Amino acid sequence: MKYSIIVPVFNRPDEVDELLESLLSQEEKDFEVIIVEDGSQIPCKEVCDKYADRLDLHYYNKDNSGPGQSRNYGAERAKGEYLLILDSDVVLPKGYIRAVSEELKREPADAFGGPDCAHDSFTDTQKAISYSMTSFFTTGGIRGGKKKLDKFYPR
């Protein structure tokens, strides 16, 4: 398996539904999805069950420990060669997995990231929030690739 898509979730079943729907539209299917429910009072298990026969989907429910620990929990259970860590509110565009694969063939990498963008279906309010969270003017260019911080040195 090439990719393990790890998604920590806290009280966001509607977002998970949209994310899983966007994963169905991917042409490249060499991935598993690991949903880590982080102590939610509004679980997304029923949403995950809807997709269980169409995606290689693994659902885990654990006590609340925050998104970082939940990402690690998912990573410990992942089988993929690469880990793609997404937030529950992500909607992937069609062709995303294929584009990642092509870029990794062209330029192998141990880690990568990218800018956020507002989906066409977003309301004006959602677009404004997205802009305030990702704009060069509000983040100083740290997000979106405008400013290179430094070389990464693993410990």
Descriptions of predicted regions:
Residues 87-91:
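The conserved acidic donor/metal-binding loop of glycosyltransferases
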Residues 95-127, 131:
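Conserved donor NDP-sugar-binding/catalytic core segment of glycosyltransferases
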